[in-house]
Amino acid sequence: MNKYITVKGARVHNLKNVDVTLPRDQMIVMTGLSGSGKSSLAFDTIYAEGQRRYVESLSSYARQFLGQMDKPDIDSIEGLSPAISIDQKTTSKNPRSTVGTVTEIHDYLRLLYARAGTPHCPKCGRVIQQQTIDQIVDQVMTLPERTKILILAPVVRGRKGEYTKLLEDMARRGYVRARIDGAIYELSDLPALNKNQKHTIEIVIDRLIVREDIHTRLTDSLETAMKLGEGLAVVSEVDGADTLYSQSYACPDCGVSIEEMAPRMFSFNNPYGACPVCSGLGVLMKIDPANILPDPTKSLNEGALRVTGWDSAEDGNGMARMYLDALSKKYGFSLDTPVGELPKEIIDILLYGTKNEKITVEYERDGRMGRFQSPFEGIVTNLERRYRETSSDAMKEVYESYMTNTPCPECGGRRLKKEALAVTVDGKNIAEVSEMSVRDAVRFFENIHLTEKERLIARLILKEVNSRLGFLRDVGLDYLTLSRSACTLSGGEAQRIRLATQIGSSLVGVLYILDEPSIGLHQHDNQKLLNTLRHLRDLGNTLIVVEHDEETMLASDYIVDVGPGAGVDGGHIVAAGTPAEIMANPASLTGAYLSGRRRVPMPDFRRSPSGWLTVRGARANNLRNITVKFPLGVVTCVTGLSGSGKSSLVNEILYKSLSRTLNRSKERPAAHDGIDGVEQLDKIIAIDQSPIGRTPRSNPATYTGLFDLIRDVFASTADAKTRGYKSNRFSFNVKGGRCEACSGDGIIRIEMHFLPDVYVPCDVCKGHRYNRETLEVRYKGKNIYEVLDMTCEEALEFFGALPRLAQKLQTMVDVGLGYVKLGQPSTQLSGGEAQRVKLATELSRRATGRTLYVLDEPTTGLHMADVEKLNEVIQRLADAGNSLVIIEHNLDVIKTADYVIDMGPEGGDRGGAVVAEGTPEEVAKVENSYTGQFLKDILAREGARPKR
């Protein structure tokens, strides 16, 4: 077998005809500056070709259901294995996905509870046994005399199919009627069933009227129904309720039956297990009164109602005003009273209506007064009705902005029916086990108490559960609970879960390509991740890891350094070899940092706070009712192990609460008592790595406001004035100046059914996006398309004489984006590049000194040299008097902070407290702070810094 993966002539994105040879069955790290081309080589070339070759081996029918990748622009790749990509962009957004379902642990738990669980009565809690026919007959006979009943045998329950043969067989066996999806049909005259829909089919065994003499006939009918329904029978009261009886399990005291103990009974994604109220989601979306009346200090006349249509009440006109006047007259309250001082009964009437009580509404039309009487629906009731009735996604989004998720009152957020929650294994139901952290679940299953029979049944199931839990623990995720929703996981957590799942599959001879698996992982847990990667390699797999973490690079077998610069300045292999060879290579920037020849510089001093923000009583998720002080006017790093409570404190409480107060957002902060010191700020801005736009029409020029200035420059030329062109003529988003053949995209998509869609340059504008007349207008010899095709560095030189343009372009260069083209589609920017575009936009604004910036792991995707540039930007924002709160694990950022708040001591239920706070020098002295111990080593090497 080939010992190497050989890539020849790779030209994807900015790769410059690259040749590279990679050793198989090794752990290879690809590194380089953000935008240097490492992801283009790893994901868009090697993975894309491996995946494409596999998909091409399938039939054309199968291919249309799989996302087929474009053939990368390469001469050849040899030695490829089947490729599996584990990146961070595929985090599930499905609210039904949990850590348990993603890792398949929940599937094994369902099987365990179905086969070895002990059922209890959901009403009285006693252990229940199988029900006899005599017990069922006795219960039916307690119905009122003369009650008409049907005895039904359920033969199909909530399954897809046509069931033609089954129904024909029932007719041959002498049965006359069936109830299909709730309606009774003659078996001789059945409707055609849709095979793609789920159906419930019950055969009518007998029709009876309850009286003393039906005892024998009822027994015979129930026995027949039980035989046909495989232990289940339905007694349906005509014009009444259905009761399901089971020969399996029923409570002799309460008469409550539990259906068959099947795995689907424990699935919240199946109607037979899901809570009927929340459909298995565990939460209900309800209109939150706090979103309707966000400011209790305002009166109704001052616009206290922040609902579309009602916020115009202060204008003195319109329907809203008429209803508010009528309500104030009817119930005797003033529209000038702050809503926080109005009686609860009045607030209830405003929100939920007058029920059937009518109010007199007066109106004016054509100068004449009129009146009508009508009940008032209530604002919340009205919004809920409109939400149910609308088919518009846009309107649904508007109504959902007033809603918040509240735990389901029926299941208490546990997602399952009460019957499923009444089944236990070793005294715990499936929800209680799912709510355990991985750490506690490992302990529970290692010491589980089962009978000899149950242990025999559960042996193989427990083996699978224990191994999967062990893999989650080994990748540093022992603080997660199995019930944790997958959409709340960070990119790094989701990636490590998929990594643990892959180890569980024990595949051999596979090429794994990973995207920064160390993201979100504290240095303390790094060794666990590295052991996992080594284990995957030792199984006989090849690992290509796109990574910037120093420890991961030093632990690898082979490093490929891509560069030397980013964008057009990158795309070459600068160095390739073992970590020792890279460190000795003078051409490798990565080698310079690894060897210590170059370091991210420390500041000369630590700034002193200009004020404080105090978060009181923070108790969201695992936070332990803590009070935390954030300094203002400085750079603060919030650190701690994964799951220690950093995001809960900063994103869920600090950011959402201040955003609601300062930005008037509808964000609902997590549980806390309050925040003191907000008056010292005028705005809060979150700078994350989400895309700056979702379509190719968005680019750095449009996001930063450069495009508006550039269009103004072109509109001010003599040629444009002669032609009567305004600045909108130079926009590719509106009709007029753009090419209408491609609507200003420059490319046209051609749909290929069994092949990937093909994008070809527009043959009218030749990919230039504008029509001929617009492109004839030039500034300093360049047209608008040629300007958008410039890099920021080229544009800075070109527009250097125009101060406003030059200032914005200079900040783009300062944050390390000089190589990015002005018109580069936002969809082609990496997360790190998108974040720096946002930082450049903020830097170019006039500083107020009263802004709080929140950054969540800004070093994601950044090389050590990029981190150095990022640090310079962060320090500039702080020098302008602004405050920064940064969630970070990267020690090169933490060591340059003015203040550190270290959360912990561990993750999950062992976290949620402040372990240490102060300058990096002060935190380094705290012995039980993991972050402090790492800082201690750095400060010993690079020297402590004084306070200013």
Predicted regions located by residue number:
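Conserved phosphate-binding elements of NTP-dependent enzyme cores
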Residues: 1-948
